[in-house]
């Protein structure tokens, strides 16, 4: 079957830059879906996305849909014929199929007609496939234009559809298909004739349009890095900003611009924020990570006088930097702590009080937590009291991303200790999955306190997160607490910290069972964390059964159990623990704590008792040092005496004293393993 390249390009007014790449991918996916449904094969595909166009190239597409057959079943044979004569049901089926009854297959249990459907020409199928793909694009809000009733993300301007070197005759979104595209708006305003689909990219390149999103992105990234190096700096190129800039230009030309050095007195985060978010510039840092008074803009034109473009961008950015400078100077006119007065009128949550109320709670809770993790209570309390002050500043009002960062600079300006200042920013860490953690113990204490206060407060008024709604980001808060404690190796008993947080709210929350509810929610987040790490859920549950209060201790136990499961003795010992657990659960009355050797009547009882005593002495110091892996490795040596015991000894002996003593022996055995985890749950 012959095949030809196919090209479709829809020209529009400027498309939303943040959505451009996803629109292109969705356009291709929709076309592939349509081609597959039509049974059309092809050898390759490529999507192109530029500010004024979406295009897809399909390589070596079948020019003819293959013929196919479908079987249509009719009535059962007993209903189709009576006394050898066709019934009305049989005749009706033949009429429905448009054939004589003689052409119907009568060899099976039912009448069957095999209908041959000849394939259609691909050119006749493509308009519907393209139209369906465009209709299925993820466009939140479509628009109409002029007198047209058509709707799309932006008004359409032209349409190219070529199968081989032939135009596919159709009209889509008010545009009649042809072979004429358009070049760069300034460099090549004339139409561009696309000779063949394979020449599409090069035809547009000659017209100063780089249609390939990936090519433009790579060019911008490479040229920006080169220019930064020439300025003895490194460019800040966030992937999302690079994508957005790529979507804004058809013919990218990066240029170096500058601003007055006096603006460097403003916190560089504020300058970077305004230049990235508002102007789409790439900022430059020196070797020490300090902002340079230069930036890179990406022009969409190759100017004969690039200085004009540079000066224009420098003129545009100056007022924005001046605003940031003004806010910074205004805020510094008063001590940071005085901004707490404004927060007394800002509601955190209607039932839980103001933002200032929250800051006071965080201060006390941070002071409680700090010494427990090796920090300073006084400095943590001070940082907690200042933690929300910058929310009332002019800087954060203009640049919300500066919360915490602004507080850091203002605290330093007021002469606060370095760790107190850092904690004002670190309280929000981690800001996302895998993001940076607090570096100071003061910051860690405030970050944990802030998150626990939110968890306890919101749970305490019954606003639990649902599957789809978590307006206070409680899941992220819980994961943040766990990450700080585990990855920073901070041994904090969360039970005490959560109970302290509950008491602070007083009558504002329903305290009964609240601490337990919050702790369960926090430790439940560990399940997903471990699953992501490839740790089996049974390992998590074996530790969860003991309900450790420390996240660090919990993690150390999980890692130990995971290592234990790789030992050859693990499976058998897990099964034995399960058997012992079942036996002990059926014991009548309390199980004795002491084992009495005088009731032994089998050598294997003595052997197991001796092995348990030796293991107990060995693992006690290990348990005290939380050497859980070593402890389980030592307990693995109990497999042989345990197996011998169960092969030779009937636990439920007729003699009540002998039976009770054997229960006590098995309880000692199980207690050794429970010092780490309930490995009976591993079976």
From Swiss-Prot:
Gene Ontology BP, a term: arginyl-tRNA aminoacylation
Pfam family, one: DALR_1
PANTHER family: GLYCINE--TRNA LIGASE, CHLOROPLASTIC_MITOCHONDRIAL 2, GLYCYL-TRNA SYNTHETASE
Protein's UniProt keywords contain GTP-binding: no
Subunit composition and interactions: Tetramer of two alpha and two beta subunits.
NCBIfam families: glyS
Catalytic function, reaction form: tRNA(Gly) + glycine + ATP = glycyl-tRNA(Gly) + AMP + diphosphate
Keyword Transferase: no
Protein's UniProt name: Glycine--tRNA ligase beta subunit
Main location: cytoplasm
Name of the gene: glyS
Family: Belongs to the class-II aminoacyl-tRNA synthetase family.
Location relative to the cell: Cytoplasm
């Amino acid at each position: 079957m012959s095949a030809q390249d196919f090209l479709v390009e829809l020209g529009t007014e400027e498309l939303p830059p943040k959505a451009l790449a996803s629109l292109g991918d969705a356009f291709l996916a929709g076309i592939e879906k349509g081609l597959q449904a039509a049974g059309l094969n092809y050898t390759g595909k490529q999507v192109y996305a530029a500010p004024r166009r979406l295009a897809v190239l399909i390589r070596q597409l079948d020019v003819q849909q293959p013929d196919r057959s479908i079987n249509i079943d009719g009535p059962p044979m007993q209903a189709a014929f009576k006394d050898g004569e066709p019934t009305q049901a049989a005749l009706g089926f033949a009429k429905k199929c448009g054939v004589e009854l003689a052409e119907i297959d009568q060899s099976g249990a039912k009448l069957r007609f095999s209908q041959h459907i000849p394939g259609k020409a691909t050119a006749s199928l493509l308009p519907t496939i393209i139209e369906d793909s465009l209709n299925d694009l993820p466009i939140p809000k479509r628009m109409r234009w002029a007198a047209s009733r058509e709707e799309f993300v932006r008004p359409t301007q032209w349409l190219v559809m070529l199968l081989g070197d032939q135009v596919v005759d159709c009209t889509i979104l008010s545009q009649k298909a042809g072979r004429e595209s358009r070049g760069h708006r300034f460099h090549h305003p004339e139409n561009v004739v696309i000779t063949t689909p394979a020449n599409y990219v090069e035809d547009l390149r000659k017209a100063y349009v780089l249609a390939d999103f990936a090519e433009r992105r790579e060019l911008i990234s490479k040229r920006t890095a080169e220019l930064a190096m020439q300025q003895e700096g490194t460019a800040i190129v966030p992937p999302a900003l690079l994508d957005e800039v790529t979507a804004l230009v058809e013919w990218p030309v990066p240029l170096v611009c500058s601003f007055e050095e006096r603006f460097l007195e403003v916190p560089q985060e504020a300058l970077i924020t305004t230049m990235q978010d508002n102007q789409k510039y790439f900022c430059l840092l020196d070797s020490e990570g300090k902002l340079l008074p230069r930036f890179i803009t990406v022009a969409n034109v190759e100017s004969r006088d690039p200085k004009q473009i540079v000066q224009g961008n420098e003129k545009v950015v100056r007022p924005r930097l001046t605003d940031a400078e003004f806010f910074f100077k205004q805020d510094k006119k008063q001590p940071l702590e005085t901004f707490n007065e404004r927060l007394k009128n800002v509601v955190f949550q209607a039932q839980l009080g103001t933002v200032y109320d929250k800051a006071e709670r965080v201060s006390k809770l941070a002071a409680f937590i700090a010494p427990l993790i090796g920090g300073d209570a006084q400095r943590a309390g001070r940082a907690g009291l200042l933690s929300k002050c910058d929310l009332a500043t002019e800087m954060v009002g203009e640049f919300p991303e500066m919360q915490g960062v602004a507080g850091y600079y203002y605290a330093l300006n007021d002469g606060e200790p370095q760790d107190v200042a850092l904690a004002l920013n670190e309280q929000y860490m981690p800001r996302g999955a895998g993001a940076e953690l607090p570096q100071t113990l003061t910051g860690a204490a405030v970050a944990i306190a802030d998150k626990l206060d939110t968890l306890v407060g919101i749970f305490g008024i019954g606003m639990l997160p649902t599957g789809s709604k978590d307006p206070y980001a409680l899941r992220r808060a819980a994961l943040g607490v766990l990450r700080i404690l585990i990855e920073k190796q901070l041994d904090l008993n969360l039970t005490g910290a959560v109970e302290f947080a509950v008491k602070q709210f007083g009558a504002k929350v329903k305290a009964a069972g609240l601490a337990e509810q919050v702790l369960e929610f926090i430790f439940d987040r560990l399940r997903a964390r471990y699953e992501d790490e490839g740790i089996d859920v049974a390992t998590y549950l074996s530790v969860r059964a003991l309900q450790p209060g420390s996240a660090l201790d919990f993690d150390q136990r999980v890692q130990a159990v995971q290592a234990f499961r790789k030992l050859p003795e693990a499976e058998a010992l897990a099964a034995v623990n399960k058997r012992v657990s079942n036996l002990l659960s059926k014991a009548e009355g309390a199980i004795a704590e002491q084992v009495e050797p005088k009731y032994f009547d089998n050598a294997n009882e003595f052997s197991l008792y001796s092995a348990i005593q030796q293991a107990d002495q060995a693992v006690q110091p290990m348990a005290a040092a939380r050497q859980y892996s070593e402890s389980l490795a030592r307990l693995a040596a109990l497999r042989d005496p345990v197996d011998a015991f169960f092969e030779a000894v009937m636990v439920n002996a007729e003699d009540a004293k002998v039976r009770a003593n054997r229960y006590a022996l098995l309880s000692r055995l199980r207690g050794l393993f429970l010092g780490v985890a309930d490995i009976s749950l591993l079976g």
